[in-house]
Amino acid sequence: MSVITIAELRAGVLAATDLTTRDRRLHTLTAALELDPVPIDTSVANHWAKLRVALRDRGLRMGVNDSWIAATALALDIPVLTQDDGFPTLDELRVLHA
């Protein structure tokens, strides 16, 4: 799991507007924190740079956080597991929707 994912989950807890949502998000964050987060290293940074250029060349957009999560997945050769629709279709990026 990317450190960016941890940050997004934590922000989701902080942004919750009701206790039910907060508790559900906190449960997800707590489970995620049991995993060792993948740091942003040189390999992830290189994949991020290539991804940004590929997106630009194809006229596609991706949020900054999503692009770091995608770069982490590319560096590890694993799919992105998401509930988010922010990942454009790219041959090199495998995306699984939960």
Report the location of each language-model feature.
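PIN-domain endoribonuclease scaffold, especially VapC-family toxins
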Residues: 1-75, 89-93
